Amino acid sequence: MKNWTAEQMRAITSRGNALLVSAAAGAGKTSVLVERVLSRVLTDTPPVDIDRLLVVTFTEAAAGEMKERLGTELLKRLNEDPGNSRILEQLELLPVADISTLHSFCHKIIRKYGRVCGYETKFAILEGPRETYLKNKVLEEILEERYEKGDRELFALLEYLNDEKNDRNLKELILNLYHFSRSNPEPEKWLLDSLNLFNGNWERFEDTFWYREIKSSTEMWLEYILELLGRAKSVAEKYGQARAFSLLAEDMEKVRGLYAKLNEGYEAAKQYLSQVKFGTFSWGRGVGGKDEAKDLRDKAKEQFETIKKRYFSWEAGNFREELRTLTSYLDPLVKLVREFSRKYQEEKRKHGFADFSDLEHWALDILKSGVYRELREKYVEILVDEYQDINGLQEEILTYVSRDGQNLFMVGDVKQSIYRFRWARPEIFLKKYEDFTDEKKIELSLNFRSREEIIATVNFIFKQIMKKRVAELSYDEKAFLKKGADYLPNANCFAELHLIEGKPEEDINSNGEPEEDLTAVHREARLVAAKILKLKEEGFKVFDRETKEFRPLQYRDIVILSRSLSNSSNIWQEELTRAGIPVYVEGAGSFLNSKEILLMTSFLKVIDNPCQDVPLAAVLCSPVAGLTYEELWQVRKEYPEGLLYDALKNKSLGKDELSVKSQKFLELLVEFQKLSRQISLAELVNEIYRKTNLPEIFGAYPGGEVRQANLKLLHDLAVDFAEINGGGIYNFLTFLSQAAESEDFSPAKLIGEADDVVRVMSVHKSKGLEFPVVFVVGLGKRFKFDYSNTVFLHSDLGFGPKFFDPEKRIRRHSIASQILSERMRRETLAEEMRILYVALTRAREKLILVGTVKNLAKKMAGWQSQTEALKDTLSDGQIARAGNFLDWIGPVVFREGSDLPDCLKVEVHPQQEKIEGEQWELPEVLRVKLLTKTPFTEETDYTGQFRAGLEFNYPGLKIAKLPAKMSVSDLKEVFSTDDVISLEDEDEVFLPGVYFEDGAMLGIVYHEFLRRIDFQGDLSASGLKAQGETLVAEGVLPPESREMLDFTKIARIFATPLGQRILRAREIYPEFPFTLGVKAGEIYPEATGFSEKILVRGVIDLLALEEDGFFIVDWKTDRVTGDILNERLKEYAGQLNLYARAVEEITGKKVKEKYLYFINLEKEVRV
């Protein structure tokens, strides 16, 4: 018999009312759930049959495990009491017991009762790639129909969303709004109620949720300001500065005064803010501490000013009018969502599909029809696992099935709620936790998973940062993890924090976006690899729970967790493999980027249209055609002009060996082209496999089984595609890219728990798992805060649209968007903190934290300066200002007076330090460029070029497949001045497509700032900085932009001849949008002679009008020089020519000149 703790026993045996069990990580909640079911069916008086219990789990795997464990326990007890008929009865009932996911339970309700209520009972579940594709298809059809009708509301909405280039923002907004509404019990009502919030029907603004949010946020920031001033006052006291001490005390009183005014109302607070003046700071000459105290006070004053600009810059009397004005955009948006919902349902019904959301909504409708009474009678108790991840719709279903919630047994841990992006509502759990009496809630805080050192580290960090106002819950004594596992002592099981100093500046790509700090990703990977090898070499041992003995560490005992692997999975794979460590990287991105799938997609493109040079080159230099790079060069050299396909046909006319190879490939291509018109796409894929032997060839590669499984998955996706679309290679390739982006998409996986490999996975993938040794990496990577949204969405607060003046083309925060963006930022931070908690609590015996920090010494000094004023925790403001995990962990570990536990060791790796394994060179990354007539030499190293060729996505399409709309940026390759391809070695090392998650904002931030400059204002560096501060306060720019924008370099623009011309111009049009019809043949040579046009949308950075015509300026943030800059200029020339043509056609005036201005290079280039 297991020795249950008192709280576990209470969770097993308590009866008579609803019960909420808050089970900390590693608390054994599954065992408790199993035992509660067993006690219900075997020992209750009277006992309950197992088919009269409803057990709801989060995943099918969890449901299967639950049934298996119940079966094992029942058999075990039957062996102990062979004649027990009660146990036999429950074993017989177990297969039909309702132990399933909520979706499976809803499906069962529909199958049993649906026909009576008018619902189809036979349908296929639509999920993953097929669901994504069908949604996009329906949405595209709706918008195309409106484009054709010239829908004015749609065009106004596109202008409002700054979507003139393309309608990507609108599509994303419609789908997000659709999903938001569907997570509610009544989607239509939620949409209309959210819209009605903008009718301005309130008596006092102070009675609205808008003001409640303003008041709550302001109070949080006031606490932070007081903490800063308190620290400055402590410095003044330390250095005996009585005048400064007195002044800071006055400052604090002025700040506290705002608390009272907030209670009086909006206008009272606004008036008070306008009257507050801070005195002049003074400090004794030659006395230390001045800079520290002044810096703290300046930060406090800056934050106080931000409160004024962020929340109290509006006129309360204008709120109603402004919000009502915004309905002119929200109303057509809601109409589009409702139309999409209706037509998407029709499309699903036509194909015989239902998605998971349908299951829940249909089941709820059926329950409401009266069926709930029968089910309430049937189920004695409903047990819900992972209750923290429930949403509003699911809660409603459970309420109906249960006896108004009175026979619900709910288990979860709100600290592990990390699925808000899937509409989870942790606040449902939190509200019950706050409302329930002690008799109705139980804390399971004993952790049976982790060593004491890990528990101490987790408690040490989270007791200081997890606070109710900023994290939605408090990490108090009740939440503390407590040791429940008995491990034998091991002196090497302390937790570790490794801080790597990152390089100070990022490389900039052609879109003005910083490339991801390769040094950071690679150095973290190398440090981890070196640490793994060291653990192995030193004979690190882990405790084996089966044998109850220590054994040597194996690779399968190790996991590497990252918040996201979207841009770094390949790096981890390469670096660990290079170190000789067997590794498996989880993630969908690796599917489309795998060699075998890249080759197949390239081949399909060539079959569809061979006039695509890059895919054709990739196929030719693959096992399909078998050409070497030397031979490819020979083909092109003999026919240097025109398409590579024409060059290949020309070569096939000869008699030499290369000509024979070319001829055989062309024959194979023609055969597949004929087959593509006669058989299904899935059959075509099969034929390609059969005739080329690609599965066998890739089976011989390293990881061959996974590669073969990927090829099979590609075939399966072709089958799926056929069910929702008649076919077509181009459409299938679109479907494939959407499939990889789907949250539910899983690439081929051929790995089990017994495989001795290190696993690399996202924190979300690790939920519910545990490992002896856990590395948590990327702690310095910035959180994602999307400030660029024009409309923010929130499940409780509804819409948060920005205000837009169509005449001045100015967007700024409305009261609604300001409040929602702030609320969403806080909720994002709370979720990120829970993600960190999940990551740290996966470890059983060894926890190693790794992060990269720029300006490490300065950062550490900042962390250390946060002194005793912080007391036991960081302030709410300090926590709320975090941009990454290290912004929490750093101050916790380094601040003065921090009681760092002995079980946590910190190691710092400066920029100049060579990390063990640093002698490995960075993998050479080659660029695919449009072909120049570069001499070919035997010495040239073409390592990696085959892959680079496969990765390139070239937009050559048949006329039948031409897009109806495209953006100017889509045309970059089309307008390039070179016309053939090259796989040319470059000295520079770049990794295309890999960006800082925060760095991707840099180009956007520069453009947002430059389009909003007051050209009549102060254009000095300080003046521009002040303009930037205003835009940050208004929410137009993110706070991070303070560090991202170089105001000195921007100021220098206006000292140049070009800048002076801009200032003297008669008219200046920042961000000038245009739409231009272009004949398809001008973009795609294969369309020459056709009358079809393509609608091209774009935005010109700056258009200036002088007496004799216009000139154009395009801002660039590239940091490249020399040959690479010349290549970029060729790419940009076509875009600028199109800009000029658009302006001339629209205005009838001549465009005299076109300029590129490279801000970081401080260089203007006339094109």
UniProtKB/Swiss-Prot annotation:
One of its GO terms (biological process) is double-strand break repair via homologous recombination. CDD domains: DEXQc_UvrD. HAMAP family: AddA (MF_01451). This is ATP-dependent helicase/nuclease subunit A. Belongs to the helicase family. AddA subfamily. Gene3D superfamilies: 3.90.320.10, P-loop containing nucleotide triphosphate hydrolases. GO terms for molecular function: 3'-5' DNA helicase activity; 3'-5' exonuclease activity; ATP binding; ATP hydrolysis activity; double-stranded DNA binding. The heterodimer acts as both an ATP-dependent DNA helicase and an ATP-dependent, dual-direction single-stranded exonuclease. Recognizes the chi site generating a DNA molecule suitable for the initiation of homologous recombination. The AddA nuclease domain is required for chi fragment generation; this subunit has the helicase and 3' -> 5' nuclease activities. One of its GO terms (cellular component) is DNA helicase complex. It comes from Carboxydothermus hydrogenoformans (strain ATCC BAA-161 / DSM 6008 / Z-2901). Keywords: ATP-binding, DNA damage, DNA repair, DNA-binding, Exonuclease, Helicase, Hydrolase, Isomerase, Nuclease, Nucleotide-binding. ATP binds at A23, A24, A25, G26, A27, G28, K29, T30. Heterodimer of AddA and AddB/RexB. Residues 2-451 form the UvrD-like helicase ATP-binding domain. Pfam families: PDDEXK_1, UvrD-helicase, UvrD_C.
